[in-house]
């Protein structure tokens, strides 16, 4: 996330096209290419951008000649036994046992969250606590090729000026009570998640919430501190 590419979700939102308005994969890609300007010179700073992941997913599909969800299932989910994890691109697909996502709070009232965007490299993966713990164990005992993939994901990736970048290759690294944490959060209308690993004490905390007002980042760290 040091490419400088503007976030296509923000570009669409600024253009009046919110997540509740139907969109096709081609619409998302068009939003990426319409803007010819970078936010900054590549490699000069960090700024999270969903565009990076959308384009990476498209590259995987082009090279593998497979749908991204099928590629992930064949290469990662099935070999690891992550039977409750999938990437379903079509929002109309019924996902068994998926919790309904909600917006609002007790004071203003709760309502079902909705979105109309297709799912791709930028997000929309559905999983379970148990499956994410399987994924966490893979970091300690890699069984997929290449075996050094977990190490590659957390390898230092400094900025062009030499300053450290806490965001590595799809994982964020940071401190907690003197220990290094590795993980990533996720959000989509009505859903919030946090995947937090503390390798130094062999601890993984997974928080999956189906209410937008919950803060999994804080919850995960509170649990880790008390563990």
Predicted regions and their residues:
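Short, well-ordered beta-strand elements
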Residues: 183, 194-211
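Short, gly/Ser/Thr-rich active-site loops of penicillin-recognizing serine hydrolases
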Residues: 207-227
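Hydrophobic alpha-helical segments
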Residues: 29, 54, 133, 201, ...
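Short C-terminal domain-edge/linker segments immediately following a structured domain
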Residues: 25-31, 202-203, 213-214
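Short acidic, gly/pro-rich beta-turn/loop elements at beta-sheet edges
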Residues: 163, 181, 205, 215-217
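Non-catalytic surface loops within mature trypsin-like serine protease
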Residues: 84, 175, 199, 211-213, ...
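Short, surface-exposed loop or secondary-structure junction motifs
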Residues: 1-189
């Amino acid at each position: 996330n040091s490419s400088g590419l503007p976030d296509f979700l923000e570009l669409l939102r600024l253009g009046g096209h919110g997540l509740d308005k139907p969109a096709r994969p081609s619409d998302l890609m068009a939003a990426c290419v319409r803007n010819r300007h970078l936010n900054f010179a590549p490699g000069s700073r960090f700024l999270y951008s969903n565009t990076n992941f959308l384009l990476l997913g498209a590259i995987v599909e082009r090279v593998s000649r497979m749908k991204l969800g099928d590629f992930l299932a064949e290469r990662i989910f099935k070999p690891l036994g992550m039977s409750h994890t999938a990437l379903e691109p079509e929002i109309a697909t019924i996902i068994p046992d998926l919790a309904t996502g909600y917006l609002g709070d007790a004071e203003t009232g709760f309502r079902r969250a909705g979105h109309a965007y297709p799912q791709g490299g930028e997000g929309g993966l559905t999983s379970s606590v148990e499956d994410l713990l399987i994924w966490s164990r893979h970091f300690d005992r890699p069984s997929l090729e290449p075996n050094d993939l977990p190490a590659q994901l957390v390898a230092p990736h400094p900025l062009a000026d030499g300053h450290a970048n806490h965001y590595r290759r799809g994982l964020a690294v940071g401190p907690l009570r003197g220990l290094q944490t590795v993980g990533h959060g996720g959000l989509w209308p009505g859903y919030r998640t946090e995947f937090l690993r503390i390798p130094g004490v062999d601890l993984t905390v997974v928080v999956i919430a189906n209410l937008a007002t919950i803060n999994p980042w804080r919850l995960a760290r509170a649990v880790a501190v008390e563990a």
